[in-house]
Each structure stands twice: as C-alpha cells, then as structure tokens.
Regions:
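Short, hydrophobic beta-strand segments
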Residues: 101-108, 244-246, 294-297
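Compact, charge-rich alpha-helical regulatory domains located at protein termini
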Residues: 157-226
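C-terminal extensions
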Residues: 171-179, 226-286
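Alpha-helical interaction/regulatory segments in DNA maintenance proteins
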Residues: 68-81, 204-249
Length: 312
C-alpha cells in the first residue's frame, strides 16, 4: 500500500432509520422531527412532498394526515444495535457513524467471501433478514469511506454498488459539490463556480489549503477519493487516559452513561489542550461475569472545534 492509499471500505446504510426505529406501519405517512424540521420521512410522506429539512407547519400542510414523531436518538441507537450485532458476524471492525450507517474496512471480509460484491451481498442478506419488510439496506464499497457512503446511495434496487479499486475519484467527480455536506464551505465553492466534486478535486492541494485552511484540505481529500486524513507519519502523542473508580458498583445503565459522559468531557478537554481532535471512540463494557461488549463510533466531524463537540 502506498503512503496515501485510501482504505478500501464498505458502508452499510439503512435508509430512513429514524422511521424504521419508530416501528410505525410502513404505509403510513410519517415524519420524524428535530428542532421543528423534518429529519426523516416515510415513502408515503415523501410522495406528498414531505422531505428532509421541511418545517413542521409546511409538512402538515402538504400532508394533513401526516403522523409527526419527535426524534429519539437513544431509541434509534438501541434499535440499531441489533443491526450492528448481525454485522459483527462478518467483521469485528464495524464503526458506527450514526444509527442507520456503519463503515468497516473490507480487506478481511472481502477475502473471506470471495470479493467485494459477494461480501456486500452477504451484508444485505443478513441485515434484510433481521429488518424484514419494515426496512431496507444498501451497501456501497469503494476506496475511502466517503466514496463508499455515496456508493451506498447509488445502490438502488440491486442494493449493492461496488466502485472498482482505484476508481473512486472518477466515481465522485460528477457529484454536486453539496455532497461534501459542509454548508459554509460548499456555499463559497459554489460561488467560485465549483459545482462538482471533480472540479474541486482538480485544484492544487496547496492552493486549497492556502485558501480554505484545514476544513478545505479535508474536503479536498474526500473529493479526490482519499481518506479524510493522511496516514500518521509522526509519533503519536503520549498515552492519555481518564478513569473513575466506582464503589459500590454501578447497577443501572443510566448511571454508567452519566459517568461515561463526565469522563468523555475530561478527555475532550485534554485533547483540546494539546490541540488534538478525536476521530473515533471505542466504548467497552464488561459485566460481572466477564462478558465484554465493544462498539466503535466514528466521528466524521472531528475537525470542528471543541466547543462544537461539547454542544452536540
């Protein structure tokens, strides 16, 4: 592998996960709201024009029979745990981007199943068997997680879209610049006439860094079909850890979650003090019987400020 060769990745995407997790009947017009805007809508609701980002009042005007639900992130995460558990049978390296979307490196699983497509189809079979008719699953495979994510959106009725190795940049090129998902940066790029990922990728990396800084550099790497950050070539910082001895032992999950949040805040502060960011977090829980459950969450917005991390 070359110094900056992207990681071959698979993304498993369960569309409309907030709707699926709500367990509402699939043929109902349903919208899940957060901050008074639609974050997910069922196929029936979309047919009436209820789409992501629409305000509550307008969505109800477009679809008077709309069933409105408030978003419950915790419930979505709990429901998605079953999907992650199924994928654990394929690989132990599943990273949760958010409930409804996971990514993992394909090297081991693809070799075991005889190729990227066979591996992706197996993912579809396992997850679809779990979800049944209430949900769908799409799998994208490409060089780098960003390209694999967009490939999962292109899977369509076949449920699988594989971008050949080395072809991620050309696959990404026609996508609109908005696919980067960074509104402020995208707005500037669009005003400069850069309407596609390909036009942005064609710029010199040095020019991008000089004009747009670190955020532009990350976005430029994504547009070029590379990983968000180049492989580390410097020594990692000294080991940092935070710990809390709990006596008597915790018996409730909410108590453990509270302690975990306090420790996470302390750790983030230490990272901030060193000018570092967090790109992944691994949470491990061990029971009194020695059973261990491990989950890895990927933080794709790790370039944002510490204050923003705390706020979200």
């Amino acid at each position: 592998m070359s110094v900056d060769e992207p990681t071959r990745s698979a993304v498993v995407w369960c569309p409309d996960w907030p709707i699926v997790a709500s367990s509402r009947v699939s043929d109902e017009p349903v919208a899940v709201m957060h901050a008074n805007r639609v974050v997910a809508s069922s196929a029936r609701a979309r047919a009436d024009g209820v789409v992501r980002g629409l305000r509550r009042r307008e969505s109800q005007q477009r679809c008077p029979s709309l069933v409105v639900l408030e978003r419950d992130i915790e419930a979505e995460a709990r429901a998605f745990e079953e999907v992650v558990g199924v994928l654990d049978d394929l690989t132990p390296r599943v990273e949760i981007v958010r409930p409804g979307l996971v990514v993992f490196p394909t090297r081991g699983p693809s070799r075991y199943f005889g190729g990227d497509r066979a591996m992706a189809q197996r993912c579809v079979e396992l997850v679809q068997a779990l979800l049944g008719p209430s949900g769908a699953v799409h799998v994208g495979v490409a060089d780098a997680a960003f390209a694999a994510t967009l490939a999962s959106r292109r899977a369509g009725d076949e449920r699988v879209h594989v971008v050949e190795a080395g072809a991620s940049a050309s696959f990404l090129a026609p996508f609109p610049i908005g696919a980067l998902g960074r509104p402020e940066l995208v707005g500037v790029l669009a005003r400069l006439g850069l309407q596609t990922l390909g036009s942005f990728a064609a710029l010199s990396p040095a020019d991008v860094v000089a004009r747009f800084g670190s955020e532009g550099e990350i976005a430029h790497r994504l547009a070029r079909g590379l990983d968000e950050r180049p492989p580390a070539v410097a020594d990692p910082p000294p080991n940092m850890e935070v710990a809390e001895e709990i006596d008597p032992p915790i018996e409730r999950v909410d108590q453990a979650a509270f302690v975990g949040k306090v420790l996470a805040d302390q750790f983030l502060q230490r990272l901030h003090d060193r000018g570092a960011t967090c790109t992944r977090i691994v949470v491990a829980a061990e029971t009194e019987h020695g059973e261990e459950l491990v989950r890895c969450w990927r933080h794709e917005g790790a370039s944002v400020s510490y204050t923003h991390l705390r706020a979200h």
